[in-house]
């Protein structure tokens, strides 16, 4: 193994000099004598390589000895990772002893070839009404949860994991990329309390970690998910938050001396996103269904980071601050959210017509809001009054109590099967529930619960 020495340290970027005949390859992992791991990013000539640190560079100094491992970063994969919390290097951070996996895989892998990839139109039921109705998920598809700060991305993500883990009993991998450590802790205990921890592998690279760590932790989680897929399983891969992956790339890019592009993002933004997203795919052996939370800076969906993510997704779930301010949770915007699966050939005529009917009614209500604000309800035609009444019921019926939020609001969570969701909304559109007061529709599960609530009002 070749050894070199540190010649320059600029924050998380470290230059190491090696003998000319033993220069490490790009992406090779290097071990500093202090125990820190570096990853080679550039070869500068003269035997010097520029690396990013996977941990804190505090306490490093020039002249320290560095050894080349001659391999990229490798992490443990397989069933031994289930129920464990690991860092970017696959080392346990839950004080439960060694992982003890039989196999280690490199975090840098080629995506499956065209021949290996498979396309599925099978729906994945989530039990969340608004998602199942308006932006249904495909098994083996990619889903983005878009939202600004504090509109409920992480809570939605936790509910999805809980529902899918309990109802579908598959394996999941959760990559916490640059999020709060408190959320990681909450998440661990939520999984433990729901008795699904033994089906989830957790990989954390939280906000306090250096950018090199946050840039690679998504790949660590993805590698573990790929192993489950290649064993013929249907695996779920959750990333919270894909924006922090981009942000880490921005920090590293500037330190590596690249010229920034629009809004200060790295010039390699699209390529970095593509490298990650192209690996999240389904093959003929198994599938990876991925749900990614995407932070939207200043609620601006045209920001380069969310805009780049859009191109890779099959379903987009857009969380809206306006809907959250009405107290309607999950705060999903049914007019902004989209899905490739919402096609009569995939979901069937009835589901498609009900979903489009719901969107049409809500859109008409949105247009009438200005008139109502100026002239009041009395100036509307009878037909429009009916549209408004039904739209307000639909808005409230799109809310739902979550299992993961039980501890905060004391309302028991609800899992609503897809056929019940369609039945409920079809009834509202057909006018079967025009006599029921709108408050009965708020925070209910199925339409039968609404009728029960209405009796007590």
Swiss-Prot record:
<comment type="subunit">
    <text>F-type ATPases have 2 components, CF(1) - the catalytic core - and CF(0) - the membrane proton channel. CF(1) has five subunits: alpha(3), beta(3), gamma(1), delta(1), epsilon(1). CF(0) has three main subunits: a(1), b(2) and c(9-12). The alpha and beta chains form an alternating ring which encloses part of the gamma chain. CF(1) is attached to CF(0) by a central stalk formed by the gamma and epsilon chains, while a peripheral stalk is formed by the delta and b chains.</text>
</comment>
<keyword id="KW-0547">Nucleotide-binding</keyword>
<comment type="function">
    <text>Produces ATP from ADP in the presence of a proton gradient across the membrane. The catalytic sites are hosted primarily by the beta subunits.</text>
</comment>
<dbReference type="InterPro" id="IPR024034">
    <property type="entry name" value="ATPase_F1/V1_b/a_C"/>
</dbReference>
<keyword id="KW-0375">Hydrogen ion transport</keyword>
<keyword id="KW-0066">ATP synthesis</keyword>
<dbReference type="InterPro" id="IPR005722">
    <property type="entry name" value="ATP_synth_F1_bsu"/>
</dbReference>
<keyword id="KW-0813">Transport</keyword>
<dbReference type="InterPro" id="IPR000194">
    <property type="entry name" value="ATPase_F1/V1/A1_a/bsu_nucl-bd"/>
</dbReference>
<dbReference type="Pfam" id="PF00006">
    <property type="entry name" value="ATP-synt_ab"/>
</dbReference>
<comment type="similarity">
    <text>Belongs to the ATPase alpha/beta chains family.</text>
</comment>
<keyword id="KW-1003">Cell membrane</keyword>
<dbReference type="InterPro" id="IPR055190">
    <property type="entry name" value="ATP-synt_VA_C"/>
</dbReference>
<dbReference type="GO" id="GO:0005886">
    <property type="term" value="C:plasma membrane"/>
</dbReference>
<dbReference type="GO" id="GO:0016887">
    <property type="term" value="F:ATP hydrolysis activity"/>
</dbReference>
<protein>
    <recommendedName>
        <fullName>ATP synthase subunit beta</fullName>
        <ecNumber>7.1.2.2</ecNumber>
    </recommendedName>
</protein>
<dbReference type="InterPro" id="IPR020003">
    <property type="entry name" value="ATPase_a/bsu_AS"/>
</dbReference>
<keyword id="KW-0406">Ion transport</keyword>
<dbReference type="InterPro" id="IPR036121">
    <property type="entry name" value="ATPase_F1/V1/A1_a/bsu_N_sf"/>
</dbReference>
<feature type="binding site">
    <location>
        <begin position="147"/>
        <end position="154"/>
    </location>
    <ligand>
        <name>ATP</name>
    </ligand>
</feature>
<dbReference type="InterPro" id="IPR027417">
    <property type="entry name" value="P-loop_NTPase"/>
</dbReference>
<keyword id="KW-0472">Membrane</keyword>
<keyword id="KW-0067">ATP-binding</keyword>
<keyword id="KW-1278">Translocase</keyword>
<dbReference type="InterPro" id="IPR004100">
    <property type="entry name" value="ATPase_F1/V1/A1_a/bsu_N"/>
</dbReference>
<dbReference type="GO" id="GO:0045259">
    <property type="term" value="C:proton-transporting ATP synthase complex"/>
</dbReference>
<dbReference type="GO" id="GO:0005524">
    <property type="term" value="F:ATP binding"/>
</dbReference>
<keyword id="KW-0139">CF(1)</keyword>
<dbReference type="Pfam" id="PF22919">
    <property type="entry name" value="ATP-synt_VA_C"/>
</dbReference>
<keyword id="KW-0997">Cell inner membrane</keyword>
<dbReference type="GO" id="GO:0046933">
    <property type="term" value="F:proton-transporting ATP synthase activity, rotational mechanism"/>
</dbReference>
<dbReference type="InterPro" id="IPR003593">
    <property type="entry name" value="AAA+_ATPase"/>
</dbReference>
<dbReference type="InterPro" id="IPR050053">
    <property type="entry name" value="ATPase_alpha/beta_chains"/>
</dbReference>
<dbReference type="Pfam" id="PF02874">
    <property type="entry name" value="ATP-synt_ab_N"/>
</dbReference>
């Amino acid at each position: 193994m070749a050894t070199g020495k540190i010649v320059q340290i600029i924050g998380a970027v470290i230059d190491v000099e090696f003998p000319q005949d033993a220069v490490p390859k790009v992406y090779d992992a290097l071990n500093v004598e202090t125990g820190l791991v570096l990853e080679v990013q550039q070869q500068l000539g003269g035997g010097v390589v520029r690396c990013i640190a996977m941990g804190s560079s505090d306490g490093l100094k020039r002249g320290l000895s560095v050894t080349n491992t001659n391999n990229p970063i490798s992490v443990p994969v397989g069933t031994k990772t289930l129920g464990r919390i690991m860092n970017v290097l696959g080392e346990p951070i839950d004080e439960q002893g060694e992982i003890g996996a039989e196999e280690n895989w490199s975090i840098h892998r080629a995506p499956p070839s065209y021949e290996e990839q498979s396309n599925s139109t099978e729906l994945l039921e989530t039990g969340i009404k608004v998602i199942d109705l308006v932006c249904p998920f495909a098994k083996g598809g990619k889903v983005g949860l878009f939202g600004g700060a504090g509109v409920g991305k992480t809570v939605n993500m936790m509910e999805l994991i809980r529902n899918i883990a309990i109802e579908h009993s598959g394996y999941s991998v959760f990559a916490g990329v640059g999020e709060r450590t408190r959320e990681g802790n909450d998440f661990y205990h939520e999984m433990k309390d729901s008795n699904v921890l033994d089906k989830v592998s957790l990989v954390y690279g939280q906000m306090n970690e250096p950018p090199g760590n946050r840039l690679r932790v998504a790949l660590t989680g993805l590698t573990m998910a790929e192993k489950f897929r290649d064993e013929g399983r249907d695996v779920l891969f959750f990333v919270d938050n894909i924006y922090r992956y981009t942000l880490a790339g921005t920090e590293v890019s500037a330190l590596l001396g690249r010229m920034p592009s629009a809004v200060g993002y790295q010039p390699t933004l699209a390529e970095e996103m593509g490298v990650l997203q192209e690996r999240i795919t389904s093959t003929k052996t198994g599938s990876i269904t991925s749900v990614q939370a995407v932070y939207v800076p200043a609620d601006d969906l045209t920001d380069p980071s969310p805009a780049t993510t859009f191109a890779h997704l099959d379903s987009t779930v857009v969380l809206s601050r306006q809907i959250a301010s009405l107290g309607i949770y999950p705060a999903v915007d049914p007019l902004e959210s989209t899905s490739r699966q919402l096609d009569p050939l995939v979901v069937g005529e009835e589901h498609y017509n009900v979903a489009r009917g719901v969107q049409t009614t809500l859109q008409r209500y949105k247009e009438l809001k200005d008139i109502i604000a100026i002239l009041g309800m009395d100036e509307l035609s009878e037909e429009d009054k009916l549209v408004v009444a039904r739209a307000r019921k639909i808005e409230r019926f799109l809310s739902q109590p979550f299992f993961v939020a039980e501890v905060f609001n004391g309302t028991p969570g609800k899992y609503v099967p897809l056929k019940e969701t369609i039945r409920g909304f079809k009834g509202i559109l057909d006018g079967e529930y025009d006599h029921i007061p709108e408050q009965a529709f708020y925070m209910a599960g199925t339409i039968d619960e609404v009728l029960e609530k209405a009796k007590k009002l």
